[in-house]
UniProtKB/Swiss-Prot annotation:
It is an enzyme of class 3 (hydrolase). The keyword Metal-binding does not apply. This is Ribosome rescue factor SmrB. GO terms for biological process: rescue of stalled ribosome. Keywords: Endonuclease, Hydrolase, Nuclease, RNA-binding, rRNA-binding. The keyword Nuclease applies. Belongs to the SmrB family. NCBIfam families: PRK04946.1. Residues 91-166 form the Smr domain. Acts as a ribosome collision sensor. Detects stalled/collided disomes (pairs of ribosomes where the leading ribosome is stalled and a second ribosome has collided with it) and endonucleolytically cleaves mRNA at the 5' boundary of the stalled ribosome. Stalled/collided disomes form a new interface (primarily via the 30S subunits) that binds SmrB. Cleaved mRNA becomes available for tmRNA ligation, leading to ribosomal subunit dissociation and rescue of stalled ribosomes. It comes from Haemophilus influenzae (strain ATCC 51907 / DSM 11121 / KW20 / Rd). SUPFAM superfamilies: SMR domain-like.
Length: 167
């Protein structure tokens, strides 16, 4: 065994170690102006569609939040109530501020449009009801929302809202 080590040392005598020549790709600088512009547009969209002062006439006389856009078939609300539509996108708003919730709602509606999803679920939770009462008021202002209804028990019950989006 020692002979092998000696043989190796004699054979490799005078050899210089190879320098590490790994190429590190330069980091791409994110264009800060583009990022700021994108954030500003998202904020403008939420402010444009979701006004806090608007008080729509919602059908909540029996404690169930529901809305149907003018010109839509009244059967849609019944289908939403029964759970005939399965939500493909889910949004959980627990613990968010009003401004954060507005931005998330706008992002959800944009995602529904981009991914061709017509039904989504918004989890509002039970909590202090500030978001739970405000979210339907915001949603009815958006032109893409066809209908909304309190979710059936299997999709969240009183703590969630199902929405139908116009594609």
């Amino acid at each position: 065994m020692q002979d092998e080590f000696d043989l190796f040392r004699t054979e490799t005598k005078g050899i210089k170690p190879i320098k590490q020549d790994t190429f590190v790709a330069p980091r791409q600088k994110r264009d800060q102006k583009k990022i700021e512009l994108k954030e500003l547009r998202a904020k403008e969209d939420t402010l444009f569609y979701f006004s806090d002062e608007y008080e729509p006439l919602l059908n909540d006389n029996d404690g169930v939040v529901k809305y149907l856009r003018d010109g839509e078939d009244s059967h849609l609300l019944k289908q939403l109530r029964r759970g005939d539509f399965s939500p493909e996108l889910f949004l959980d708003l627990h613990g968010l501020t009003r401004e954060q919730a507005k931005q998330e709602l706008a992002a959800l509606l944009l995602a529904c449009e981009n991914e061709h999803v017509d039904c989504a679920s918004i989890m509002t939770g039970y909590g202090t009801f500030t978001l739970k009462k405000q979210i339907p008021r915001w949603l009815v202002q958006h032109p893409k929302v066809r209908a909304l209804h309190q979710a059936p028990r299997e999709w969240g019950g009183e703590a969630a809202i199902l929405i139908l989006v116009d594609l």
